[in-house]
Amino acid sequence: MASVLEKVLRVGEGRTLRKLQNYAKAVNQLEEDFTHLTDEELKNETVELRERHANGESLDDLLPEAFAAVREASRRTLGLRHFDVQIMGGAALHLGNIAEMKTGEGKTLVATLPAYLNAIASRGVHVITVNDYLASYQSELMGRVFRALGMTTGVILAGQTPQQRREQYAADITYGTNNEFGFDYLRDNMAWQASDMVQRGHFFAVVDEVDSILIDEARTPLIISGPSAGDANRWFTEFATVAKRLVPEVDYEVDEKKRTVGVLEAGIEKVEDHLGIDNLYESANTPLISFLNNSIKAKALFKKDKDYVVMNGEVLIVDEHTGRILMGRRYNEGIHQAIEAKEGVAVKAENQTLATVTLQNYFRLYKKLSGMTGTAETEAAEFMSTYKLGVVPIPTNRPMQRKDQSDLIYKNEKAKFEQVVEDIAERHAAGQPVLVGTTSVEKSEYLSKLLAKKGVRHEVLNAKNHAREAAIVAQAGRLGSVTVATNMAGRGTDIMLGGNAEFLAVAAMNARGLSPVETPEQYETEWDDVFADVKAEVDEEAAKVIEAGGLYVLGTERHESRRIDNQLRGRSGRQGDPGESRFYLSLTDDLMRLFNNGAAASLMGRDSVPDDVAIESKVVSRAIRSAQGQVEARNAEIRKNVLKYDDVLNRQREAIYGDRRHILEGDDLQERSQRFLEAVIDDVLDSHIGEGNGDDWDFDALWTELKTLYPISITIDEVITEAGSKGRVNRDFVRREILSDAKLAYSKREEQLGGAAMRELERRVVLSVIDRRWREHLYEMDYLKDGIGLRAMAQRDPLVEYQREGFALFQQMMGAIREETVGFLFNLEVEVQAPADAESVGPRIQAKGLAANQATADKLRYTAPTDDGGVEVRNQRGQIEKAATAKAQKDQQAEDAVLVGEDEPETPQGPPARGAFGQPTGASSSAPQNREERRKADRRK
């Protein structure tokens, strides 16, 4: 029964559909007019629509003509005419909704409609896909439609240079994955020059497979990180050895449902004996506890060939939703290192966060957001609460003919798979194509062996051979084909009966060496003939497949998400084709074992039902729905909490990134420097003097601190003399004198360097200090979040505590930024150089002890989320990151030292050592310390 919230969300659905139908009618009325246009006249429609929009007409007003133009361009270039329901879907997207369209209804073609309409505003449109292959394929194919209308298309792919990315973003419509768009946003907010930025804003986005991207992948943030120092690798290896000696239920206990472990007293004693320590839980040993927990989790919760595989000396994650190997992705929080130590392969270093954003908060940046999927209704409430997106179900073009059969339940897995093989063999013999869905690599290979033994020819599409996945899926609807797939979520390629003519035609064109980008004229000339030949062959075979019953989808296990099950079923019965689906289950399936197993087990009885006899039962079906509901609710709660905590950081991120953007865009920093100077002097005075008079003040300590900030020229005696006596010196008087002296020093500094050089120095100093302090702040916030759950033990709300303490940390960071900026401005040794060439604006400066953050760009890692908590790590060039070696760590530390104002180690002939702000002092160089850090150091002494 639908929940109250679901009923509320469906209110107005009929009214929305009527509005969309009216748009479709308006487009149909214009269709004949557009068919009479020449190619040149059709292309000029874009120019005319842009002029009208510039003169005040809204995009809503232009929708019928824009959609009619796209429909005609598509008919001419691709031979595909948008159906009325596709026009309705396009209108729903333009209005900022999620269009729920069943598999095979042509979502890729639908996206061209709102993309073109919103590109009329000349502010850039982003079409987000689930992988690089689909981004490239769709931009190439749909780019032909946009080019016929005089618009440009770009694609963002891993490994592109900043210049290439800038060019792709400058296009009217840009395709790419959520990871690439998100990382470019983060990189833009680490840029040193405005010219280094690649994106031009966040105007409108269409997200394909929106549930996969905005729901499944929303639990883990995008992270840009660099290698961190430490000897953690040794401890991972040490604790992997310890974990092997620990016995389940004696030394530790495991909760598979909650994915947690707990160490028992006997286990703690074994660990303490192995390490030679008295108490694992005393403060000095606290960091070791996480190593112990991770090593036990790696042993008990993460299974080889199910959760991960080991290939070429690397641990590679298997995506639980798609069954693919996630190349370069890693579990976070030390889990991946623990698994590497368990398997005896090289343990890679953990990384330090430099920039991060969740997908929820990245997509909230868009002025207007929309999405498409075949299965959004189950998550409608979350889409509305998180993204303010309504879900609009779009009718199918033709009535659904697929028959969804009841589940068959067996006592054990062996009996289940025996019956699965018999069913497949029978369908295969009749020529009916079969698509089999499994939940793991291990099970797909087990089934493959059984099919081979039975003599059934088949293709296996799993995490170990996904390079050919698009080609395999495109042919899964051919006569007599059998395809075993670990999962069909996010595949993105239609299974058409008789074969995918469009895919085959593109492959044939590529085989001829033709490209719509590099050889557009020849491509357009030959496309029609090639497509017609392929289509004729496919249509002939499709008729035979329809006679055999259409595509048969067989699921070997229920997934924990109803959407994944529905996506698998949805591969059959596209566009009104006949089809059939059925799930085979057993009592030993993971979902049945972990949730509600009792009801099913009691129904079947351990002795009364033979192994090879299946039952169909409403009790079991209810148990499955209940189990899936529990898992979905748990995952939704995780995403909700991720968002709550990231919202705290997001407000801080917006403030910092907004500051950086203004600086990059040329804000005059002179006024900011003056404000910083006043604030820092106020802070110094607050820490050294009270509200009374000077009799009780420590003037020596005050002047010592001021000298670290700027070259103070007035003396204590001069201030006292000016006031008349020490007792007549008050705070306002001292502040006025010191501030006057500091501003005079600032003017002298500007006069010495020149106005233009001073502005450039201010820009570089502020950016450098902001970036380093923000990086350290992210580390502090991570550390705070890791331990914030303990506040609940003190009867305090962890989220409220996180907000309060996070704000305090932010205030401390801002104070440190102000203080260090002032110190650097006055104390850095600066060499002013003439412009490099006639085109350069202003002088160049060399500031000793200050370096741009791009120094570490080649060592940055890019971490992308997966729905199972794993992370994808690539380097700056988009290549999979293989290892964080000791040398890389050493190099990173050296570059970090430069970034924080240190010099390289001196040789006897080298320059003098520099102090906290890069000034020559004759003392050893050290990391910049703000006032709070210096006090902590003093207290330790």
From Swiss-Prot:
What quaternary arrangement does the UniProt entry report? Answer: Monomer and homodimer. Part of the essential Sec protein translocation apparatus which comprises SecA, SecYEG and auxiliary proteins SecDF. Other proteins may also be involved.
Q: Which HAMAP family match?
A: SecA
What job does this protein perform? Part of the Sec protein translocase complex. Interacts with the SecYEG preprotein conducting channel. Has a central role in coupling the hydrolysis of ATP to the transfer of proteins into and across the cell membrane, serving as an ATP-driven molecular motor driving the stepwise translocation of polypeptide chains across the membrane.
Subcellular localization(s) per the UniProt record: Cell membrane; Cytoplasm
A Pfam family reported for this protein in Swiss-Prot or TrEMBL:
SecA_PP_bind
An example molecular function term from Gene Ontology annotations: ATP binding
Keyword rRNA-binding annotated? no
Protein name (record): Protein translocase subunit SecA
Q: What family name appears in the similarity comment?
A: Belongs to the SecA family.
Alphabetized UniProt keyword annotations: ATP-binding, Cell membrane, Cytoplasm, Membrane, Nucleotide-binding, Protein transport, Translocase, Translocation, Transport
Annotated residues for binding of ATP: 86, 104-108, 494
Where are the annotated segments for Disordered? 880-941
Database matches in SUPFAM superfamilies: Helical scaffold and wing domains of SecA, P-loop containing nucleoside triphosphate hydrolases, Pre-protein crosslinking domain of SecA
GO CC, alphabetical? cell envelope Sec protein transport complex; cytosol; plasma membrane
Give GO terms for biological process.
Answer: intracellular protein transmembrane transport; protein import; protein targeting; protein transport by the Sec complex
The EC number(s) given in the record are 7.4.2.8
Composition skew (Basic and acidic residues), residue ranges: 930-941
Q: How does it sit in the membrane?
A: Peripheral membrane protein
Going by the record, the broad EC class of this enzyme is translocase
Broad class of where this protein is predominantly found? membrane
Substrates-to-products reaction catalysed: ATP + H2O + cellular proteinSide 1 = ADP + phosphate + cellular proteinSide 2
Q: Which gene encodes it?
A: secA
